[in-house]
Amino acid sequence: MDEELQAIRQARLAQLQAEHGSAPSNIASGPSSNQQQQEVQDEMRQNLLSQILEHPARDRLRRIALVRKDRAEAVEELLLRMAKTGQISHKISEPELIELLEKISGEVSKRNETKIVINRRVQDDEDDWDL
């Protein structure tokens, strides 16, 4: 699967470079080339996600990105890392995506957990103002 995925990546990269009229080079020529590289990387990322996720799961991830971009990016990174290491053998369905989201949200809530401590005054039996 890695060889097939790599071939798809190379073909898509060649196609995008042909569209932009640029040859592959390691020399950056200003912010426009950085922007083009970012666009190419985003395109490759979206292609990989479309290969990993079923359509309903992809739609759910897009809706989540509208509300919580950080969570959506964390899930995308996790999915891409799992795909690169060969942990994904089939397309991820929507219920499986929900499980991943719950896992990530549980980790985030543990990190961001705040405790409120209320120190109540101890009732003092001895008054200084005995009149």
UniProtKB/Swiss-Prot annotation:
GO cellular component, one term: cytosol
GO MF, one example: DNA binding
The family this protein is said to belong to: Belongs to the PDCD5 family.
A single GO BP: chaperone-mediated protein folding
Biased composition (Polar residues): 23-34
Protein name from the UniProt record: Uncharacterized protein C23C4.09c
Pfam families per UniProt: dsDNA_bind
SUPFAM superfamilies, alphabetized: Double-stranded DNA-binding domain
